[in-house]
């Protein structure tokens, strides 16, 4: 059989590229995860593209879908980014809009027999995602969500000498991962230096106090950056990306083993 024939026999992992018959066969044959990348279109400093969160989440999701014999649904590109709207190019949706969209997408995937799994790349989406999962559960639909970066604490400690100062937003981690995935999109001459501003973490949020606050990002740092992007490298990005894929694949495998 020719290479062309082999390629034609392999179904794509992108849900939207399947036929309706192929999608139904997937869910009839086995419990199948439909992985929905969620991200944002928002400022990531002067050196990274606006779609940084989505770009990383999509790349991780594609790898995970392949290893888990799942599918990737179309990504939810716009997220909850109100705190970045003073920076050019940021596009934000209201939390209620985001929650409603997640609810409807997951309900449709569940109706088609898939296990909805939201693979998130933007911290601002985490709280709304939890609300959406609760709303879905109240209607009898079980969906799952996790952020690719949450399981990386141990790896970050290996890669960066002071991860609490190196990692935040448009930081050493994200810059490294984009250097690995899409190096042509990194404006290396514009990478800012100077580290995390002294106002972060918020000096009023004392250790042990569970206090929440939402502030515009320019109050934290007018450069749009938290962390030390100057510490980034493509090699570090590859290590972090592979770790994100491995940890995310483990999470999806555990999800699929759970009794529905």
Task: Explain the meaning of each model-derived region.
Residues 2-116, 123-260:
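Extended, histidine- and acidic-residue-enriched regions that form the cofactor-binding/catalytic faces
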């Amino acid at each position: 059989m020719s290479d062309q024939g082999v390629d034609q026999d392999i179904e794509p992992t992108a849900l939207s590229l399947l036929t309706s018959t192929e999608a139904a066969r997937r869910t009839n044959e086995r419990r199948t995860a439909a992985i929905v990348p969620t991200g944002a279109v928002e400022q990531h400093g002067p050196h990274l593209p606006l779609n940084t969160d989505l770009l990383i989440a999509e790349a991780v999701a594609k790898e995970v879908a392949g290893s888990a014999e799942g599918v990737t649904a179309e990504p939810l590109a716009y997220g909850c980014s109100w705190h970045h709207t003073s920076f050019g190019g940021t596009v934000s949706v209201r939390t209620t809009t985001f929650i409603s969209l997640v609810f409807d997408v997951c309900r449709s995937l569940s109706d088609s027999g898939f296990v909805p799994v939201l693979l998130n790349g933007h911290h601002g989406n985490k709280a709304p995602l939890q609300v959406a999962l609760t709303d879905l559960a109240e209607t009898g639909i079980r969906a799952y969500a996790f952020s690719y970066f949450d399981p990386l604490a141990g790896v970050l400690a290996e890669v960066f000498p002071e991860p609490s100062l190196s990692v935040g937003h448009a930081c050493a981690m994200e810059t490294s991962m984009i250097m690995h995935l899409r190096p042509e999109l990194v404006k290396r001459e514009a990478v800012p230096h100077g580290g995390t501003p002294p106002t972060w973490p918020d000096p009023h949020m004392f250790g042990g106090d569970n206090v929440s606050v939402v502030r515009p990002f320019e109050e934290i740092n007018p450069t749009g950056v938290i962390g030390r992007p100057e510490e980034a490298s493509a090699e570090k990005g590859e290590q972090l990306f592979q770790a994100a894929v491995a940890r995310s694949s483990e999470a999806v495998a555990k999800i699929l083993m759970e009794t529905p």
